[in-house]
């Protein structure tokens, strides 16, 4: 407004039509702002009578030309009237607008209220409208809000609140199962499972015409798999846990009824994904017909490598937590099944396919062996005792123990077995019938590994105790004292442990004393 007045002043005090129009618009805006300020002021302060005169400017009016001096006789603005209101109002604008803007900004920050579940809804909107995963939506939301906070400092406080809520949602967001199921992802996942249930129901009446539904089923399975991978795992859990895992049990029955290889492979991928969502899924599958069905499928279709690998992986997942198996399951997972696994490992073809088969089946063998606490009833050890040699099994197990890898650790769930590879070796060397499966060269490598681990591990570490126990079994059930590989180094290590007086070393010292007592003729 001052610019318009300055232009008019330089033009002899004459306003053009365009300038007058712009002034009217600006004055209307000023009236609106003033009314808002009065409303805010009336809520926080006692009421006062409005001034009849406009606020005087805080600085002198612009210097007028000689023409304007002659026409305006005085410098102070006149009492507002219909003819002079625009000029006086315009002169007072700079101070009034600044004050009012400051008041509005301060008040608007106080009045910003973030609605409940705002962050949850924002993350879901990002998922729906962009197709990104639930995890990625956190990154996107944080990036946007941080950018707004940086570029618009006046709203930094509410942006900080939003960032804090995002962190809380990521780390400890708590929602009822009902609210999770009602989310967009929850509804989509439930819809996909309902479609699978319909296919399962139709499978009992399948005819040649229904085989045309294969592309549709595959698309639905792929869509469901994508949803489960991208969605919030809490949402997936909530949907799965409904009615005692009804959707999961229905999918297992559908797998049992479905014989098309392409659909079976897709279902196996689905089971693998579900195992990673909730530990309870593994418990449910362990007590279902799925393990027996997978064991039967593997033995009936040995030429289908892809089906073998997927079935083996899902079985390894189901056995990974070492939960007790239902007794009736041993009718299908019997000696015949273990013999099949070992035979496939030892007769695996050369090349990449053979390597994949060995890796997968050895992992399954280790996972299955976790479930046996009684050595006499251990199906895996009973079958190995009848084998003359297990070269591939031995080499793979030695590689795993040397690398300190456990192929059975697939999830972060609690497990009943700390290390499947170490447990397998403890079982093998617990009997002379199985300890002879390892060649002398393998034994020497194993002794080097045991010495390294026992030396490096700290007192109180459960693994050190297990390695010491394994060393004692090697001394007991092999011909170690015929070659005495690394004997002096092992003796020094054992004597050092025997002298440890920490409470954490008590169990280890007990094992060492048993070794010295049992083999006193060899140790000085």
Describe these PLM feature segments.
Residues 1-200, 469, 478, 490-524:
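Intrinsically disordered, low-complexity regulatory regions
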Residues 12, 133-138, 148-340, 350-359, ...:
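Elongated alpha-helical scaffolds that mediate protein-protein interactions in large eukaryotic proteins
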Residues 219, 266, 293, 310, ...:
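Alpha-solenoid helical repeat scaffolds
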Residues 225, 272-273, 316-317, 366, ...:
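Structural signature of alpha-helical solenoid repeat scaffolds
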Residues 248, 294, 298, 341, ...:
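Long, well-ordered core segments of solenoidal/helical folds
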Residues 298, 307, 439, 444-515:
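Extended alpha-helical scaffolding segments
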Residues 346-350, 356-453:
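Amphipathic alpha-helical interface segments within eukaryotic helical scaffold
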């Amino acid at each position: 407004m001052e610019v318009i007045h300055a232009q008019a002043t330089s033009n002899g005090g004459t306003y053009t039509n365009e300038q007058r129009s712009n002034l009217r618009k600006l004055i209307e805006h000023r009236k609106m702002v003033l009314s808002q300020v009065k409303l805010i002021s009336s809520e926080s302060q006692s009421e006062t009578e409005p001034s009849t005169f406009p606020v005087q400017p805080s600085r002198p009016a612009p210097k007028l030309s000689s023409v304007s001096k002659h026409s305006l006789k005085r410098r102070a603005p006149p009492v507002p009237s219909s003819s002079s209101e625009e000029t006086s109002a315009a002169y007072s604008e700079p101070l009034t607008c600044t004050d009012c803007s400051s008041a509005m900004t301060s008040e608007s920050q106080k009045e910003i209220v973030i609605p409940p579940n705002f962050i949850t809804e924002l993350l879901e909107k990002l998922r729906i409208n962009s197709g990104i995963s639930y995890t990625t939506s956190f990154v996107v939301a944080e990036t946007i809000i941080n950018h707004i906070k940086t570029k618009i400092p006046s709203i930094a406080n509410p942006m900080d609140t939003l960032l804090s809520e995002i962190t809380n949602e990521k780390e400890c967001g708590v929602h009822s199962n009902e609210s999770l199921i009602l989310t967009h992802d929850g509804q989509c996942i439930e819809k996909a499972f309902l479609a699978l249930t319909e296919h399962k129901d139709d499978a009992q009446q399948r005819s040649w015409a229904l085989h045309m539904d294969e592309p549709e089923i595959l698309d639905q399975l792929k869509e469901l798999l994508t949803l489960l991978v991208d969605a919030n795992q809490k949402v997936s859990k909530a949907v799965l846990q409904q009615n005692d895992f009804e959707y999961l049990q229905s999918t297992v029955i559908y797998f049992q009824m479905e014989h098309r290889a392409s659909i079976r492979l897709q279902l196996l991928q689905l089971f693998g994904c579900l195992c990673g969502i909730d530990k309870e899924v593994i418990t449910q599958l362990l007590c279902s017909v799925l393990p027996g069905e997978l064991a039967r499928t593997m033995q009936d279709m040995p030429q289908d490598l892809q089906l073998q690998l997927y079935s083996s992986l899902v079985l390894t997942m189901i056995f990974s937590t070492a939960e007790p198996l239902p007794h009736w399951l041993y009718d299908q997972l019997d000696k015949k099944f273990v013999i099949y696994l070992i035979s496939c490992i030892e007769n695996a073809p050369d090349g990449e396919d053979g390597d994949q088969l060995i890796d997968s089946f050895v992992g399954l063998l280790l996972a299955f062996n976790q479930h046996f606490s009684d050595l006499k009833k251990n199906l895996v050890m009973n079958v190995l005792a009848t084998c003359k040699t297990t070269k591939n099994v031995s080499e793979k197990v030695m590689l795993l123990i040397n690398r300190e890898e456990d192929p059975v650790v697939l999830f972060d769930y609690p497990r009943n077995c700390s290390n499947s590879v170490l447990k397998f070796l403890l079982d093998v060397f617990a009997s002379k019938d199985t300890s002879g499966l390892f060649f002398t060269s393998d034994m020497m490598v194993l002794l080097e590994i045991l010495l390294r681990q026992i030396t490096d591990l700290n007192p109180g570490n459960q693994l050190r105790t297990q390695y010491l126990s394994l060393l004692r079994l090697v001394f007991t059930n092999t011909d170690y004292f015929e070659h005495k590989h690394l004997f002096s180094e092992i003796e020094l290590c054992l004597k050092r442990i025997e002298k440890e007086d920490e409470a954490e070393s008590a169990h280890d010292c007990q094992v060492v004393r048993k070794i010295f007592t049992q083999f006193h003729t060899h140790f000085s």
